[in-house]
Curated annotation (Swiss-Prot):
Pathway: Amino-acid biosynthesis; L-histidine biosynthesis; L-histidine from 5-phospho-alpha-D-ribose 1-diphosphate: step 9/9. NAD(+) binds at residues 129, 191, 214. Binds 1 zinc ion per subunit. This is Histidinol dehydrogenase. Its EC number is 1.1.1.23. Keywords: Amino-acid biosynthesis, Histidine biosynthesis, Metal-binding, NAD, Oxidoreductase, Zinc. It comes from Methanosarcina acetivorans (strain ATCC 35395 / DSM 2834 / JCM 12185 / C2A).
Length: 433
């Protein structure tokens, strides 16, 4: 029997609200285990990778890197129609992320003789993690590799868990080829993150690790962030839907089910001003849960779901901003009213014909997004995750002279005499005398 939280938002207890909004990621529960695996990978390299792949993925591998022959076999096994669909999605992803590219170098004169600028430089290397296990995610390969390539990253590798026979799903390998990955490794979980962070005999160390994963992968990313930069915590998937009586109950329910099939820990929430819609969605969710292919996962996930009835649209918006969802769907008559008031959301889907799967696969926006409330402080994966910025100063003698007294006064106030003298020497002062 599926049980979802169903009540008026104003009647929900403090404990119920805290559970929904905090929706604990479980990072603390797995931290010690993750730390142990990471340490082992750092010390023993490939030997540790083989051991953990056998333990967690139940497969013994002779080697981790996907060979060219395996790529060719995979591509021959993917039908031309499916390959074309990959290319359609890839094209949209590429166009959207190209639009995000900043001017490589720019300058401005803030006052005569003082020219300032900024230079954007791509990272040298990036490791993309694509989950496996319950399903293969070629779409995640596109979402992580293509922006890195658009940004100009020189080396992009992919780690994804092997199947029971030691292979990688052909469509995942096809996606890696379409996206432009340099290498693909048959590695998943904590050990994959450790390999990319520290480097092993086989896996090169990277500057940054991006991509979603389960709580173990997320914990691993958080723990290695002083060795290799990461994008953000991206754990179990979630959606919050703001709807009014103009929304279609079957559509809303199908979007809840779609999110629930990702993972038993996925979170799906509807907040609506319509009691009639709320009840209709609840009934529709129960019906659809029985008939979907991944019914058991969906039913488990729905234990984390909620249907909440708000007094006003403003109350719905306020709750959404506190919840800070990974995915936010807006299915109301006046969508701009809601959109303009949203502060915290990873990706926003506006209207009845913009369900989350559109962004998951083919619209072109990125589906690697912060979860568990981290949308309050993080942006979804974008071109800037693959770039770093250097500020530039071009100062003439007259420009420095105009700032001389200000710099000297502030440096001396901070007790940094040599800083002040570095300015004076450019105007005849000899600090050695």
């Amino acid at each position: 029997m599926v049980t979802m939280l169903f009540k008026k938002l104003s009647d929900a207890s403090e404990a119920e609200m805290k559970k929904l909004i905090s929706r604990g990621s479980g990072l603390a529960d797995v931290g010690e285990t993750v730390s142990s695996v990471l340490s082992d990978v750092r010390v023993r390299g490939d030997a540790a990778l083989r051991e953990y792949t056998k333990k967690f993925d139940k497969v013994e591998l002779a080697g981790f890197e996907v060979s060219e022959a395996e790529f060719e076999e995979a591509l021959s096994g993917v039908g031309p129609e499916l390959l074309e669909h990959l290319k359609v999605a890839a094209a949209n992803i590429r166009v959207f992320h190209e639009a995000q590219l900043p001017e490589t170098t720019w300058f401005m004169e803030v006052q005569p003789g003082v020219v300032l600028g900024q230079k954007a430089t791509a990272l040298e290397s990036v490791g993309a993690y694509a989950p496996g296990g319950r399903a293969s995610y070629p779409s995640t390969v596109l979402m992580t590799v293509i922006p890195a390539r658009v940004a100009g990253v020189k080396q992009v590798i992919v780690c994804t868990p092997p199947r029971a026979d030691g292979s990688i799903h052909p469509l995942t390998l096809a996606a890696a080829k379409v996206a432009g990955a340099d290498k693909v490794f048959k590695l998943g979980g904590v050990q994959a993150v450790g390999a990319m962070a520290y480097g092993t005999e086989t896996v090169p160390k990277v500057d940054k690790i991006v991509g979603p994963g389960n709580v173990f992968v997320t914990s691993a990313k958080m723990q290695v962030r002083n060795v290799a930069e990461i994008d953000f915590p991206a754990g179990p998937s979630e959606v919050l839907i703001i709807a009014d009586d103009s929304a279609d109950a079957a559509m809303v329910a199908s979007d809840i089910i779609a999110q629930a099939e990702h993972d038993p820990n996925a979170v799906s929430v509807l907040v609506t001003t319509s009691e009639i819609l709320a009840e209709a969605v609840r009934q529709e969710v129960l019906l659809q849960a029985e008939n979907t292919a991944r019914s058991e996962i969906v039913k488990t996930s729905l234990e984390n779901a909620a249907v909440l009835i708000s007094d006003t649209l403003e109350q719905s918006i306020d709750f959404s901003n506190k919840f800070a969802p990974e995915h936010l769907e807006i299915m109301v008559e006046d969508s701009d009213f809601v959109l303009n008031r949203i502060k915290n959301a990873g990706s926003i889907f506006v209207g009845n014909y913009a369900p989350v799967p559109v962004g998951d696969y083919a619209s072109g926006t990125n589906h690697v997004l912060p979860t568990a409330g981290y949308a309050r402080i993080y942006s979804g994966l974008n071109i800037n995750h693959f770039l770093k910025y250097s500020s530039i100063q071009k100062i003439s003698k007259s420009g420095l002279e105009s700032l001389k007294e200000t710099i000297i006064a502030l440096a001396e106030e901070e007790g940094l005499q040599a800083h002040a003298d570095a300015i004076r020497t450019r105007f005849g002062y000899k600090p050695s005398k």
